[in-house]
């Protein structure tokens, strides 16, 4: 039943806002540092908060956390949210099985466990065998492990060890037969790619340095270690990713080079010879995503096909004139693809829902893979294995994973998240609305069946809009709680993502980024115009690049929203390029670089931190960030919190929840995930009057 403002909710709000009135945000000192960018003087009143190790900054973080908890911990709705999220998250979860040496290797988190562990299971069936347990590594469960790659024979497992949520890890090699680590680990660093040689006598890995870029190394497994050899990367800058892929037959090393999110290159090396890696695909302004099939490469690309196509390349007979198109571009964008056994599985997005088509490796159409319904599906596997995996989820269907036989099409359930949720009570509708420039944008609305718009329904609007990321339907426990309590959960598939191909992506990057914000604002206006909700009942939610989205929108149209959740955001787009200790150089190819005069103009025009105006009635805002975010600079959230607290002229609170061990790369124990998710949802429920 929807919690509309009656006596009890009204009493709840009066009490909550009374607490807000009594508890005021901590004052923050201003230092007003002035810088000039291309003739424009910019004054930063909270520049000092960029120094993360400074004692004054640490004290500021403590005071801000105390303020946020003083407002949030006592909310009556918090207890019920915590109980419900616990019920929806405390179940066995499995991720990413990979078949090697007759065993499936996978990550698993048991219902009562805090972190993911690494297991294996015989492909023919049997019990799960625990290989790597992170529990003994730290008393507070903030040290986690992750599966990197398994050798072809299944005897050696590379796994990462991560502190908190930082991107940096150690890389360990685990001897599966001896049940112990083999040799010394690679020390803590920014590793961003790993591949075993087929004979398991060594491996390739990518080592990243934020100032110098990535380099590919080869590590031989010899007694006493030895010196790792640099294989590739000289001349590439910090705005480039490099990742190795070895062919299952042991013949080839493929090197994938990615320049931001819009351009890629491929290099390869014949491992039977002694020559260095040589160019395969270079100098083309498009992406190339490869998979091996024996001596062939199947490559998904948007070259001359903005919505994607698949090419076939014979590595024994090179030359662009020899490339063959095996899957042509169509009306729907190709999201991903898999080569399993002797077949090609192509996942297209039809109005943002998955449709998986089957082809021979020469492009003959062989039918489709039936999915449980509209939602997000996908497949993965290898060309030399007849069995792959199929997954599916939707906004009202929890995640399921199936073993899939490529020869017969037979599937068997591997795992289903046992979430207690009554899917049949709810429905998902897709609507289309015009953006500012007339572009039609799709949006999913998830709510209880039979909802009649009356302008009063509490609504959360979510978006991302960037980096070619497609926001496809997936089950979200926070959204599930929201719709169970009568709300609408809305997801706008705005430009900048990959839902409709590369043109959709590029229409939301660099100097076109304002399109993303306009699309999101138009979604809010449409929801209000069509009487689904009103500004006092509307919250927006986004993280990372989506944090930039909601940060920009709240500064451009603050009157449209009651509340904002802004998770680990990018916000100071003028100084962003100066944050060299964070993983920002590739993102400059998506956002732009304020050191370049032409790009400074549009970055300065929308940069949320520079757009804050004193005396404005801003919505309630909850920021989240943490010291361990080594990808999105946390100083941005710190500075934005202080600036909005000083500027706002409304009675709605601005606060930050700052976890010193939190970052972009997960590693958070489940109890902390539930705690953080509860506080975020309680904040929105409080502001929108939901119990």
Describe the role of every protein-language-model region.
Residues 214, 218-257:
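Polar, glycine-rich mid-to-C-terminal structural blocks
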Residues 131-134, 176-187, 223-235, 272-281, ...:
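Blade-edge beta-strand/turn elements of extracellular beta-propeller
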Residues 102, 153-155, 199-201, 249-251, ...:
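Short coil/turn segments that connect the beta-strands within blades of beta-propeller domains
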Residues 128-147, 158-161, 165-207, 213-217, ...:
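Asp-box/WD-like beta-propeller blade repeats and closely related beta-sheet repeat scaffolds
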């Amino acid at each position: 039943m929807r919690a509309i403002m009656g006596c009890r909710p009204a009493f709840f709000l009066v009490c909550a806002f009374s607490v807000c009135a009594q508890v005021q945000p901590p004052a923050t000192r201003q230092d007003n540092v002035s810088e000039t960018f291309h003739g424009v003087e910019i004054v930063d009143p909270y520049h000092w908060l960029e120094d993360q190790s400074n004692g004054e900054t640490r004290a500021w973080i403590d005071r801000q956390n105390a303020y946020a908890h003083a407002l949030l911990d006592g909310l009556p709705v918090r207890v019920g949210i915590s109980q419900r999220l616990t019920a929806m998250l405390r179940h066995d979860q499995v991720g990413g099985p990979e078949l090697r040496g007759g065993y499936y290797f996978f990550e698993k988190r048991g219902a009562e466990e805090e972190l993911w562990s690494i297991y294996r299971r015989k492909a023919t069936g049997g019990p799960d065998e625990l290989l790597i347990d992170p529990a003994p590594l730290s008393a507070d469960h903030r040290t986690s492990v992750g599966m990197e790659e398994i050798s072809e024979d299944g005897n050696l497992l590379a796994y990462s060890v991560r502190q908190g949520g930082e991107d940096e890890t150690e890389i360990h090699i685990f001897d599966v037969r001896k049940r112990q680590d083999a040799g010394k680990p690679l020390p803590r660093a920014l590793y961003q790619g790993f591949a075993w040689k087929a004979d398991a006598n060594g491996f390739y890995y990518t080592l990243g340095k934020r100032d110098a870029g990535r380099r590919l190394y080869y590590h031989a497994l010899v007694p006493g270690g030895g010196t790792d050899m640099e294989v590739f990367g000289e001349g590439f800058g910090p705005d480039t990713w490099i990742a190795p892929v070895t062919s299952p037959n042991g013949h080839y090393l493929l090197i994938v080079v990615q320049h931001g999110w819009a351009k890629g290159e491929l290099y390869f090396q014949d491992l039977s010879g002694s020559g260095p890696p040589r160019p395969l695909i270079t100098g083309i302004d498009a992406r190339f995503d490869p998979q091996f099939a024996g001596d062939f490469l199947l490559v998904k690309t948007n070259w001359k096909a903005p919505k994607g196509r698949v090419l076939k390349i014979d590595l024994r007979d090179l030359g662009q004139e020899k490339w063959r198109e095996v899957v042509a571009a169509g009306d729907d964008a190709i999201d991903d693809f898999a080569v399993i056994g002797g077949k090609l599985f192509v996942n297209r997005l039809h109005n943002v829902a998955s449709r998986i088509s089957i082809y021979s490796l020469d492009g003959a159409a062989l039918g489709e893979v039936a999915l449980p319904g509209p939602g997000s599906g996908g497949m993965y596997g290898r060309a030399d294995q007849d069995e792959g995996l199929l997954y599916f989820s939707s906004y009202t269907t929890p995640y399921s994973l199936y073993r899939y036989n490529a020869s017969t099409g037979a599937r068997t359930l591997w795992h289903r998240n046992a979430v207690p949720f009554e899917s049949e009570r709810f429905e998902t509708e897709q609507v289309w609305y015009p953006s500012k420039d007339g572009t039609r944008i799709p949006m999913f609305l998830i709510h209880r069946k039979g909802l009649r718009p009356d302008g009063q329904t509490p609504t959360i609007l979510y978006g991302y809009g960037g980096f070619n990321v497609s926001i496809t339907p997936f089950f979200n426990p926070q959204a599930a709680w929201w719709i169970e309590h009568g709300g609408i959960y809305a997801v706008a598939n705005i430009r900048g993502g990959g839902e409709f191909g590369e043109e959709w992506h590029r229409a939301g990057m660099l100097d076109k980024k304002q399109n993303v914000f306009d699309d999101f604002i138009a979604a809010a206006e449409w929801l209000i115009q069509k009487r689904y909700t009103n500004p006092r009942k509307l919250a927006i939610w986004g993280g990372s690049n989506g944090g930039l989205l909601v940060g920009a929108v709240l500064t451009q149209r603050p009157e449209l929203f009651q509340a904002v959740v802004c998770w680990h955001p990018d916000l100071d787009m003028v100084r962003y390029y100066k944050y060299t200790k964070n993983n920002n150089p590739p993102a400059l190819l998506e956002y732009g670089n304020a050191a370049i005069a032409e790009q400074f103009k549009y970055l300065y025009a929308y940069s949320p931190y520079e757009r804050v105006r004193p005396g404005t009635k801003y919505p309630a805002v909850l920021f989240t960030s943490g010291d361990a975010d080594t990808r999105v600079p946390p100083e941005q959230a710190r500075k934005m919190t202080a600036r909005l607290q000083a500027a706002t002229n409304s009675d709605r609170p601005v606060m930050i929840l700052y976890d010193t061990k939190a970052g972009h790369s997960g590693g958070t124990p489940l109890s902390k995930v539930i705690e953080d998710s509860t506080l975020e949802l309680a904040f929105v429920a409080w502001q929108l009057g939901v119990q």
